[in-house]
Design a protein with these regions (language model features):
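Domain-level signature for proteins that mediate thiol-based redox and metal-cofactor handling
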Residues: 2-165
Length: 165
């Protein structure tokens, strides 16, 4: 039997701000992270360095609740992990469609319904964890004439598609 493994090399990301909170005691890095993010613009990346126990799960829950995204986790640091966090959205969006937990073709079907509700030139954000979503969204874009502005994928495989009508 052969093990199926993926190697995730560190992407070429340039954070606008770095926040080193190694050694920080309770309540942990989230309050300091919130304060620092106030100085970061929408669509920019912050690098949080932390060795706080349980921070990875806390960050993912916090990011989902606050419309941020944990893009990548650098686990190669000598002390603590490096969390690359995208603040907010890359583009202004008129509507958000979150179909996380739904199987394909649900993302494209829901995006189609939402596009009917917005005007030409406006954007939607489609959030999906379906592994086939990138392929399906690209095919859908080509057949509908909409424009894919960007796609991001977080460290847990959740995609954000920014689509212009």
């Amino acid at each position: 039997m052969t093990a199926n493994t993926k190697t995730h090399a560190m992407p070429d990301m340039k954070p606008q701000t770095t926040l080193d909170l190694n050694g920080l005691a309770s309540p942990g890095p989230l309050p300091a992270l919130r304060r620092t993010l106030r100085t970061v613009e929408e669509g920019q990346v912050l690098l949080l360095i932390s060795d706080f126990p349980g921070i990875e799960n806390d960050l993912h829950v916090w990011a989902k609740q606050t419309n941020h995204q944990v893009l990548f986790i650098d686990r190669t640091r000598p002390r603590g992990f490096g969390f690359f966090i995208l603040k907010g959205d890359l583009w202004p969006v008129e509507r958000s469609v979150d179909v996380t937990g739904s199987h394909c073709p649900t993302p494209v079907l829901e995006a189609s319904k939402t596009m009917v509700q917005i005007r030409a030139g406006q954007n939607i954000k489609l959030v999906s964890d379906c592994q086939a979503a990138p392929l399906e969204v690209n095919t859908w874009i080509k057949t509908t004439g909409h424009k894919l502005l960007a796609m991001t994928e977080d460290s847990r495989g959740v995609y954000r598609f920014y689509i212009k009508k």
